[in-house]
Swiss-Prot record:
Membership in a protein family: Belongs to the mycobacteriales LppA/LppB family.
Protein encoded by which gene: lppA
Lipidation, N-palmitoyl cysteine type: C33
Keyword Cell inner membrane annotated: no
InterPro entries, alphabetized: LppA/LppB/LprP (IPR032018)
Signal peptide bounds: 1-32
Main location as per UniProt: membrane
Protein name: Putative lipoprotein LppA
Superkingdom classification of source: Bacteria
Amino acid sequence: MIAPQPISRTLPRWQRIVALTMIGISTALIGGCTMDHNPDTSRRLTGEQKIQLIDSMRNKGSYEAARERLTATARIIADRVSAAIPGQTWKFDDDPNIQQSDRNGALCDKLTADIARRPIANSVMFGATFSAEDFKIAANIVREEAAKYGATTESSLFNESAKRDYDVQGNGYEFRLLQIKFATLNITGDCFLLQKVLDLPAGQLPPEPPIWPTTSTPH
């Protein structure tokens, strides 16, 4: 069965939940399978170009390992923030829909999701919102850890009592500290090959994922 398609991490939290719900509905309607492709990008490369791109990415390691590293970094940031700001706590988001979205990752630009994905760390939820000064402390910690990944381009859309955000990107990575009704930390990584693709010999395309029949099989 084809894995669920990753959800864009640029969507707000509630829109990601709606998108995941719609995927579940479509899965039921077509007999338990969801289409997992990215036609806008996968058509840009020939088969030989895909092979060359895949082989050039092999030394980066796997998507699964990269996701573990990012989640470890999210934990480091959250621990540092909690230690620096008295009374602050944190936990990984326990919403099953968000957890599923994080596990699925985000789409790459030139390879379909059955070949490569962008890892998403487990989402961090802080126990309390930040004051203006505390948000600066947290953002500085995010900045320091993001720089270790080569992410140094900073931006912010809003900085007021009701809404604050800090975003830093670079080298294919994005770290985002966001506060609206509650404060969260989200980290998205560069594009990495799935482990099952790394396990295949170089110089060839992975086999096409199977598409199961949509009609029920008699027992």
